[in-house]
Amino acid sequence: MPREIREIKDFLVTVRNKDAKEIRIKKVGKNLTKFKVRCGRYLYTLRVADNAKAAKLMQTLPPSIPTVQVDSNKK
């Protein structure tokens, strides 16, 4: 079940949960970046429209959780 998180602080708290398994980063278009964290029950999604904030958030992610960069497939 997907859940959307709107605040960066809430996303960082969710990423540091014990049941967080994987973080997927997906760039959509020029400015939009989606961060998805798979937890035990839900898939949490954060949308960041600013490239500078997205780059800063990538640096603050915990290294203990595997991070996967996903390419957006445009048809």
Swiss-Prot record:
- Per the record, the domain of life is Eukaryota
Keyword flag Ribosomal protein: yes
Keyword list (alphabetical) reads: Ribonucleoprotein, Ribosomal protein
Q: Which InterPro entries match?
A: Ribosomal_eL38 (IPR002675), Ribosomal_eL38_sf (IPR038464)
One GO molecular function term of this record is: structural constituent of ribosome
- The UniProt record lists the keyword Ribosomal protein: yes
Which GO biological-process labels does this protein carry? protein-RNA complex assembly; translation
The terms describing its cellular component in GO are: cytosolic large ribosomal subunit
Q: Which family does it belong to?
A: Belongs to the eukaryotic ribosomal protein eL38 family.
Q: Which PANTHER family match?
A: 60S RIBOSOMAL PROTEIN L38, LARGE RIBOSOMAL SUBUNIT PROTEIN EL38
| Stated name of the protein | Large ribosomal subunit protein eL38
Query: Which organism is this entry from?
Result: Dictyostelium discoideum (Social amoeba)
The encoding gene? rpl38
